[in-house]
Amino acid sequence: MPQTINTNLVSLNAQRNLSMSQSQLGTAMQRLSSGMRVNSAKDDAAGLAIAERMNTQVKGMTVAMRNANDGISLAQVGEGALGSVGSLFQRMRELAVQSANGTNSSSDRISLNQEFIQLSQEATRTLGGTKFNGLGILATTNDAIFQIGANSNSDVDRLTVTAFDWAANTSINSVLGSTVLSGTGTPTLQITDTPNAQSAISAIDTAIDAINAQRANFGAVQNRFENIVNNMQVAVENQSAARSRIMDADYAAETSALSRANILQQAGNAMVAQANQLPQQVLSLLKG
């Protein structure tokens, strides 16, 4: 290598290597301090794009899980209310069976019928007043649509819970009658004599079947939502793990990189200092 004064190639090379080691040291320190392997797009452009898409999915699925849990709550509220109505109908049936007995006097049947009417009105109030977040559950013609996925695919990411309008259910309506609208009126079905009581028994049996069918539907919906939540939790876990492998810093590897960069930094500083002294050797030639 020729000896020159104006251009110190050895020093330039040492400075370039020192700059590289400084950059490596800065990168290692940034990753260790932030906990992230990718702190900007320049660190891993493709990886950042993939990780951000995964992050979008994870956030969407997290919200979808909350939506599904709302569905579970709605089904629980609806099923609980129907359970209460079912108990009221069972008591009404007991009263009808008791009233159908020929040993009852007219005053006995009037007393039985008064309780029967009160229970009918309470059943109507419960059915009409059961709400979830202000929305009627058992007295609505509008299906409840739940967003249970992170995307907009209607077949995969949405679940429709079919509306239940008890007022339109002939089996239940035949028991409650005119109390459907007000909750305080006199029901069409009464137990003031044996024939009416026997008719009431048959009508209530049919109404109880309708109540139980809808309770079973709510139970099935609840189970489905629970499975959706469980599957979503697994998906979130896997997506988060995949994103972590791209974005998160490996502390063992980064600590090793930091130590290496520190050593190179110290060695580079020493070599630059020595390289800057090389032009001084030209003076020995001039003195000769």
Model-derived segments and spans:
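Primary detection of the long, small/polar-rich alpha-helical "axial" segments characteristic
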Residues: 1-288
